[in-house]
Amino acid sequence: MFILHATILTVFPEMFPGTLGYSLAGQALHKNIWSYDVINIRDFGLTKHKNVDDEAYGGGDGLIMRPDVLGSSIDHALSLNPNAEIYYPSPRGRVFTQSFAKEMLKNKNLIFLCGRYEGIDERVIEEYNVKEISVGDYILSGGEIPTLTILDCLIRLLPGVLMNQNTLSSESFEEVGEFKGGLECGLYTRPEIWRDRAVPSVLLSGNHRLINEWKKEQSRIITKLRRPELLKDL
């Protein structure tokens, strides 16, 4: 029985599962830890050309995805996934973070509405209480890549996906564990010396207390240099 189910609305259904069919996410998909279905918005398009967009009222550049077309596709998605939360990747949405990912997983049924063109009609957001979600302060061509990104993060958090679930607590942005919401320290493996660069001696000492102290201090230094706004919570 799957733990997470995602319904994806898109005009490019062939983009899924995409990268989610590989590595950890792909293995979890085959194990039925998560599942998905894709709905082609064009199946609900108008005229023989299956149009899904139209010109914007009030002028402006770009075309807008029509509310009647999106409404029909969302209604169909809700018939398959009735208790789902609906998310719309959008640059004006709440910024996606590790803590937001955990919050999203309180509902194991999710619908992702992948916009295209200039965006979607605002009335769709109002009608279905759609939650807008942003993956950063930049613009992409559509919502498919953000959806893949968000799902990859969510899937890693599901029980049974990682061989060692404790790995999560030692990663960047985790609120519990070694780095307390900061950035992860540098990582090292064999060989011990590479191009005259040596592994820090403390990591070879076998002294777990000193190693943990070193990791925490390195995390603090890296976080201060690269993401100082995270330190307020450390």
UniProtKB/Swiss-Prot annotation:
Keywords: Cytoplasm, Methyltransferase, S-adenosyl-L-methionine, Transferase, tRNA processing
Protein's recorded name: tRNA (guanine-N(1)-)-methyltransferase
Organism superkingdom: Bacteria
Main localization, broad class: cytoplasm
InterPro entries: Alpha/beta_knot_MTases (IPR029028), tRNA_m1G_MeTrfase_C_sf (IPR023148), tRNA_m1G_MeTrfase_TrmD (IPR002649), tRNA_m1G_MTases_N (IPR029026), tRNA_MeTrfase_TRMD/TRM10 (IPR016009)
EC id: 2.1.1.228
GO cellular component terms, A-Z: cytosol
Compartment(s): Cytoplasm
Broad class of enzyme this protein falls into: transferase
Residues at which S-adenosyl-L-methionine binds: 115, 135-140
